[in-house]
Amino acid sequence: MCSLSAIMLLPTKLKPAYSDKRSNSSSSSSLFFNNRRSKKKNQSIVPVARLFGPAIFESSKLKVLFLGVDEKKHPSTLPRTYTLTHSDITAKLTLAISQSINNSQLQGWANRLYRDEVVAEWKKVKGKMSLHVHCHISGGHFLLDLFAKFRYFIFCKELPVVLKAFVHGDGNLLNNYPELQEALVWVYFHSNVNEFNKVECWGPLWEAVSPDGHKTETLPEARCADECSCCFPTVSSIPWSHSLSNEGVNGYSGTQTEGIATPNPEKL
């Protein structure tokens, strides 16, 4: 989620990148802190705003795209996914709400290098709704591997902001079906480092949006083995879970797509 350029150029002494007196319109998104200053003399250091401070969601910086989904359709009957990306040029977030991952948001060398997108999908498992969120920590190239611990820290810190973006962007759905606020949030951290390759339950959605929410390292309930009406969708719209075999890496096994590891239940 954090821009790799910001990770690589952290100053030895962190300085506040924001003044409390600055207006919201001039502040950059707290989700990504690779901010650009107008004066050239200040561009020698990449500012890292609120690196260890509170993460704040700013709705004015969120652009929402509805792509082929009906706001009135419950996600237990129609696939519903979220693709959240950030622009270093505009400092704004883009949230696509669609039936499958919006791959067009993930194109370009910067996106492939930073891997700071967050994707999620609604699932119904044995009659219970849940939101499954996926983050890429490391794998794919050595720079991501080098900063795996730092990336994990940033993702954990900023995920409440991401979830608030989901709630705000898909507000009509949640207003129509308030019971979805009680749906459990499962966060999948994909990494080739065993320590960070895990699944965590962040509790119900209303709690997960809080930075003080309770987190437990555990596994979600598996869908029914046979065809049924209590589980939906039958196939995940997140491609990270079923592609190339990756048995040879310590700590995880099973599948991998473009360097993304799938947490191994037997290792958790």
Curated annotation (Swiss-Prot):
Do the record's keywords include Cell division?
Answer: no
For the null mutant, the annotation states:
RNAi-mediated knockout of the protein results in a stay-green leaf phenotype. No effect on seed degreening; probably due to redundancy with SGR1. Sgr1 and sgr2 double mutant has an embryo stay-green phenotype.
Q: In which tissues is it expressed?
A: Expressed in roots, leaves, seeds, flowers, buds, petals, sepals and siliques.
Q: Which reaction does it catalyse?
A: chlorophyll a + 2 H(+) = pheophytin a + Mg(2+)
According to its record, what are the GO cellular component terms? chloroplast thylakoid membrane
Q: Explain the purpose of this protein.
A: Magnesium chelatase involved in chlorophyll a degradation in the chlorophyll-protein complexes of photosystem I (PSI) and photosystem II (PSII). Contributes to the degradation of PSI and PSII in the thylakoid membranes. Required to trigger chlorophyll degradation during natural and dark-induced leaf senescence. Mediates chlorophyll degradation during embryo degreening. Recombinant SGR1 possesses high dechelating activity against chlorophyll a, very low activity against chlorophyllide a, and no activity against chlorophyll b.
Q: What is this protein called?
A: Magnesium dechelatase SGR1, chloroplastic
